[in-house]
């Protein structure tokens, strides 16, 4: 077979047209040391801060230290197979985690990989773990309540959607219990919840998952778990990963709640990483940027306006505001709230719920100290009826605390002082609440009305809780229409006050407790 010159030239032209001489440039470095989850890489010239670095064995590192001639990176995973002399490559990407509705009801690790044995997460959406918080122009003031269902919080330290409210106290005094109750109370409200467990035992996290499933709260909750057995790197990035998952809902005009349990352990993990990276230590051996560690995380919790949501969704969602409410938890040592990390987070957040060991041991649970606890913006978001009825509760407790210390020295007290002490004791008893027994707005208002109007004054202290239980049972059976009306409107006027009075007096007359 003989080809003509024209056919040969045609074939050559075709081959030239199809020839693809693409050159892929990769920045390559050499690992010069690996120890304690930290790799030092020489020769990565184009790496950026926070970039993912491809390491041997399908493992990635996070570039944290950019030196003149080397890069310090923390390994996100197992590093025992990595050795000196191995190659490392830039990826040009920063760390992203999966986001979206498909994550609801799932337990994932800090990188978004499922760890609950229910298969892969069915989402293609991802989001960077580090994002700039919305600016002032895109924010809206906090004016919608986020009901926790806990009397002492909703009446005295109200939380609004888009607020950052710190829960602070020693270990084992009910910080997580408050957060879990708040998540359970969001059932049916449309608020999506993210619970970030940092440095906790796997058994503790499994117990929380079981509790949320038992009370039907898991279907609106994502759990991000960086257990005590996970590396410091995963404990450090877990809150940022959880925040990105929450921002997915915020940016689409929905409401979300995120619990960081707890940021003390994240600060410990970051301190460990920083010391291993040879960063200069400061107060309590923390690095200089530990304030920025928490501020850049908590500033991402916000209420955003309609324009922000419309711009983010390219006009798909209009006329809706979004919010991400944060409940960071800080563990103190022997009640010392003046330590480095507690003071940092107190200054960043919009208020704090302070739990005290002495109150917990005396039987007051939740062990909230109303004197040290404050909500800086939640008052504007409080439901009308709770705001009206809760004012008297705070006043009664303030007077009680003042007189309680004085009464220990005074032998004969006048009638008015004795009445204030009696009411204070009964209000304190009323604020006791068992875990997993959150209240609706109407039932809470009923309890506060009874206390505010002196219906508890002639009861024994031991009768207060049984009376409240009987009052709620009566209201839910005989006066369910009133309860439904209050829950729907949350208004407080003379008509509602009269209806509450009828219910309380009916219960007092029955004496069925």
From Swiss-Prot:
This is ATP synthase subunit alpha. Disulfide bonds: none annotated. Keywords: ATP synthesis, ATP-binding, Cell inner membrane, Cell membrane, CF(1), Hydrogen ion transport, Ion transport, Membrane, Nucleotide-binding, Translocase, Transport. It catalyses: ATP + H2O + 4 H(+)(in) = ADP + phosphate + 5 H(+)(out). The record marks 373 as: Required for activity. Its main location: membrane. ATP binds at residues 169-176. SUPFAM superfamilies: C-terminal domain of alpha and beta subunits of F1 ATP synthase, N-terminal domain of alpha and beta subunits of F1 ATP synthase, P-loop containing nucleoside triphosphate hydrolases. Its EC number is 7.1.2.2. Belongs to the ATPase alpha/beta chains family. GO terms for cellular component: plasma membrane; proton-transporting ATP synthase complex. The lineage of its organism: Bacteria, Pseudomonadati, Pseudomonadota, Gammaproteobacteria, Thiotrichales. F-type ATPases have 2 components, CF(1) - the catalytic core - and CF(0) - the membrane proton channel. CF(1) has five subunits: alpha(3), beta(3), gamma(1), delta(1), epsilon(1). CF(0) has three main subunits: a(1), b(2) and c(9-12). The alpha and beta chains form an alternating ring which encloses part of the gamma chain. CF(1) is attached to CF(0) by a central stalk formed by the gamma and epsilon chains, while a peripheral stalk is formed by the delta and b chains. NCBIfam families: atpA (TIGR00962), PRK13343.1 (NF009884). The keyword Transport applies. The keyword Ion transport applies. It comes from Francisella tularensis subsp. holarctica (strain LVS). It is a peripheral membrane protein. InterPro entries: ATP_synth_asu-like_sf, ATP_synth_asu_C, ATP_synth_asu_C_sf, ATP_synth_F1_a_nt-bd_dom, ATP_synth_F1_asu, ATPase_a/bsu_AS, ATPase_F1/V1/A1_a/bsu_N, ATPase_F1/V1/A1_a/bsu_N_sf. One of its GO terms (molecular function) is proton-transporting ATP synthase activity, rotational mechanism. Produces ATP from ADP in the presence of a proton gradient across the membrane. The alpha chain is a regulatory subunit. It holds the Pfam family ATP-synt_ab_C.
